[in-house]
Amino acid sequence: MDVVSLTPLMERTSGRREIVIGLLDGPVAVTHPDLVSAIVREIPGKQGGTSAHASSAACLHGTFVAGILCAQRGASAPAICPSCTLLVRPIFLETIVTSDQMPSATPDALAAAIIETIEAGARVLNLSVALAQPSTRGERVLEEA
């Protein structure tokens, strides 16, 4: 946290409800004890933003990142901006996978999710993703989004 100077910022503010942070990741287990007071919305009409399978790799990752952003202060997660609104747009399929598989999404799906999340009001995006294979087309689609 101190490497990126977040501690002084976190001492000054916990964020504001009107600041909407888009989380493009897996679904989120909103019933997690550290997230019960978090302000979480999901993009309507899409695959659910809340987790149906808490043990899926997608849900574990989405919930972990949500905790970093908006868990209750004093919880096990950093809780960088717990008073901001978290807008969840899952991009990872919620399947039970083996330990050597990572959740994935295509560049097209990620680009569409970026656009949808911005159109739904997010002004800050959190993406914990990388291209698995180099792709000029994939990079171009993401740049356009």
Label the model's feature ranges:
Residues 48-49:
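Low-complexity, polar/amphipathic intrinsically disordered segments that mediate membrane, lipid-surface
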Residues 136, 140-145:
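Short acidic, glycine/proline-enriched helix-loop-strand junctions
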